[in-house]
A protein has these predicted regions:
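Short helix-boundary/capping micro-motifs
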Residues: 25-41
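Short alpha-helical elements of helix-turn-helix
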Residues: 10-30, 78-81, 85
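A short LG(V/I)-centered, amphipathic sequence patch enriched
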Residues: 55-73
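Alpha-helical residues within the helix-turn-helix
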Residues: 38-39, 56, 78
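Residues in the recognition helix of alpha-helical DNA-binding motifs
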Residues: 50
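Short, Lys/Arg-enriched N-terminal segment that forms or immediately precedes the first helix
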Residues: 1-12
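Alpha-helical linker/hinge and terminal dimerization helices associated
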Residues: 57-58, 80-98
Length: 98
């Protein structure tokens, strides 16, 4: 029952929705919030608000360096990007398993 106690311990952390991760990956891939919004069918404003909540409320870490319309990932953002890609890949596998 070690797994149950581990899950209970981890449940105190905030959760991150897969749609937020998908948006985060789109920003990294597209290099900006507007193009990422087009990819995930959201407005630039909605994408911006999602990422602000992720940075400030959930992770309490800066994920992006913003230079005008250009966006680059911080070192913390690079780490999250690797995890996000893996999580989304696993999520897709789970949903496609019969």
């Amino acid at each position: 029952m070690q797994y149950i106690s581990e899950i209970d311990r981890l449940s105190s952390y905030p959760s991150i929705d897969t749609e937020v991760l998908r948006t985060f990956v789109a920003i990294a891939d597209q290099g900006g919030f507007t193009r990422a919004g087009e990819q995930v069918n959201r407005t630039q404003s909605a994408v911006s608000m999602q990422m602000k909540r992720l940075e400030e409320d959930v992770l309490q870490r800066k994920l992006f360096e913003r230079d005008g319309r250009q966006v680059r990932l911080t070192p913390e953002g690079q780490v999250l990007l690797g995890y996000a890609r893996r999580i989304l890949k696993l999520h897709s596998k789970v949903l496609n398993t019969s």
